[in-house]
């Protein structure tokens, strides 16, 4: 499989080593998403998956567009709307495509772009807690972690 990636321990790539989801039973966590492999489907974030775990994180690669800008941004590919974020019903949505870190959406579901950790020197740290819910913090990379 793709250069032996299936043989690398603890490496999980949606669309490569797993079709669309990875379950981590020890954390009662499922991470799901779809690899964008072509231009025949321009919808990066589909409706919710049936839950099999306490925690669910959705991943999507695309461009978030707020409701007021939706018509003006029709030229963009892989658009993500507030409705799509809400419909996924995940506990957290990890987004990729933007170089800068940002929280997006109407807040119904926590949705964040991590930006470029290498350029910013930071990452999003997500904590899932049964009592306090989802907490997101920007944390600096240490010099050794950034290499």
List each model region and its residues.
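Acidic, His/Gly-rich catalytic cores of divalent-metal-dependent hydrolytic chemistry
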Residues: 119-147
């Amino acid at each position: 499989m793709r250069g032996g990636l299936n043989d690398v321990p603890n490496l999980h790539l949606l669309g490569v080593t797993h079709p669309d989801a990875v379950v981590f039973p020890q954390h009662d966590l499922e991470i799901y998403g779809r690899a964008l492999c072509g231009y025949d489907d321009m919808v990066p974030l589909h409706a919710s998956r049936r839950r099999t775990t306490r925690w669910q994180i959705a991943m999507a690669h695309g461009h978030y567009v707020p409701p007021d800008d939706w018509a003006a941004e029709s030229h963009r590919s892989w658009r993500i709307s507030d409705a799509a974020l809400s419909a996924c019903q995940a506990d957290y949505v990890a987004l990729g495509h933007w170089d800068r870190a940002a929280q997006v959406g109407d807040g119904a579901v926590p949705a964040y772009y991590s930006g470029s950790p290498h350029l910013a020197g930071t990452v999003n740290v997500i904590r899932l807690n049964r009592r306090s819910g989802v907490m997101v913090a920007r944390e600096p990379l240490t010099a050794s972690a950034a290499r």
